[in-house]
């Protein structure tokens, strides 16, 4: 859980974050359906690069146009993946942003999977 925002130059906390107790905002049946749909995005949809994770995962890809172009005319886009892992009882929510991308070596889902694998290896 994120504890604080740090000053990049000094490493000192700029803002300490509080964590209010969670509360249900949608019915349990709706939440279960949404989770199942997000798991399908990983299993069969646009985020299959995260499909091999132990415990499964769910998530959503996204692309946002920036209106910025290279001198050659290619548009720079913001590529997103937001996911949770493991699927059944999520412990982590991870968001990957590839800012101003034209071509990427790895998808956001693949980067997400690498982070999850590192978390699993760390115990």
Say what each PLM segment does.
Residues 19-24, 28-29:
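A structural-propensity feature for long, helix-poor, extended segments
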Residues 1-9, 13-21, 38, 42-123:
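Active-site beta-strand/loop architecture of penicillin-binding DD-peptidases
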